[in-house]
């Protein structure tokens, strides 16, 4: 499953190769996808290469080869410009007492199947994922009401809040947050990170819980809340 940005970039590269015989420059890709910097293009290119859609040819400038295009199942549901994406899509876990849905291979009537929607960065923001991979079984009384999902934590920027690399973060879907909440924040509609949310005047601060990382101060129009942390699932 490709994200909307990944699909748009792959389509743009493929069309340019057909039209001109050479791939677009990074500046052209940045402008075509309305990104603020070329670092976002580097991340998208790497993601497409890792997924086997493109190949970068060594020792040649601007040498990108499109290996394949996604089939219908690998395309975003809506790839047109102006579409507002959500990093978390699909049917999320809901508590439906008194008969919660059991997780896969789990028949405990007191548990709920919570979908794992990908990985979340507790460190440098990583590209947002939109694919549901599997479910985990969570005690129903941990969740309360509303919709929930889980994200695998990658990084160590929240260790002082007790959130470790490899933990499964349990998230209540929400688009608002109070100061002090630990949230899933979508930055510039393309990167997701797990940080503590605070308001600083007219700006939003995304604070790590590790002195080795810096606080990010961003205008509200660059940040969209995707949910609030309600618990952790950890295997020993």
Curated annotation (Swiss-Prot):
Region described as Disordered: spans on this chain: 85-109
Biological process according to GO: DNA repair; DNA replication; negative regulation of DNA-templated transcription; proteolysis; SOS response
InterPro entries reported in the protein's UniProt record: LexA, LexA-like, LexA/Signal_pep-like_sf, LexA_DNA-bd_dom, LexA_repressor, Peptidase_S24_LexA, Peptidase_S24_S26A/B/C, WH-like_DNA-bd_sf
MF GO annotations: DNA binding; serine-type endopeptidase activity
Keywords of this entry: Autocatalytic cleavage, DNA damage, DNA repair, DNA replication, DNA-binding, Hydrolase, Repressor, SOS response, Transcription, Transcription regulation
Keyword rRNA-binding recorded: no
Catalytic activity: Hydrolysis of Ala-|-Gly bond in repressor LexA
DNA-binding region as annotated in the record: 26-46
Enzyme Commission identifier(s): 3.4.21.88
Reported function: Represses a number of genes involved in the response to DNA damage (SOS response), including recA and lexA. In the presence of single-stranded DNA, RecA interacts with LexA causing an autocatalytic cleavage which disrupts the DNA-binding part of LexA, leading to derepression of the SOS regulon and eventually DNA repair.
Subunit: Homodimer.
Family per similarity comment: Belongs to the peptidase S24 family.
Protein name (Swiss-Prot/TrEMBL): LexA repressor
Protein species of origin: Rhodopseudomonas palustris (strain TIE-1)
Gene for this chain: lexA
């Amino acid at each position: 499953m490709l994200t909307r940005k990944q699909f748009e970039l792959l389509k743009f590269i493929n069309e340019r190769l057909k039209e001109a015989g050479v791939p677009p420059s990074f500046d052209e890709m940045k402008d075509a996808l309305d990104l603020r910097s070329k670092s976002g293009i580097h991340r998208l290119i790497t993601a497409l290469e890792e997924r086997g859609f493109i190949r970068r040819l060594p020792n040649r400038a601007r040498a990108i080869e499109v290996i394949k295009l996604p089939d219908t199942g690998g395309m975003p549901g809506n790839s047109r410009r102006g579409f507002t994406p959500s990093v978390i899509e699909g049917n999320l876990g809901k508590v439906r007492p008194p008969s919660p849905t059991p997780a896969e291979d789990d028949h405990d009537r007191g548990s709920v199947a919570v979908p794992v929607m990908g990985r979340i960065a507790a460190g440098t923001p990583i590209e947002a994922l939109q694919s549901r991979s599997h479910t985990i079984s969570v005690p129903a009384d941990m969740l309360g009401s509303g919709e929930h999902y889980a994200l695998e934590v990658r990084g160590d920027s929240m260790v002082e809040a007790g959130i470790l690399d490899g933990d499964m973060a349990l998230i209540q879907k929400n688009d608002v947050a109070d100061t002090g909440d630990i949230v899933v924040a979508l930055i510039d509609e393309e990167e997701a990170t797990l940080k503590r949310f605070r308001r600083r005047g007219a700006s939003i601060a995304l604070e790590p819980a590790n002195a080795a990382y810096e606080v990010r101060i961003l205008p509200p129009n660059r940040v969209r809340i995707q949910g609030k942390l309600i618990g952790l699932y950890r295997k020993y």
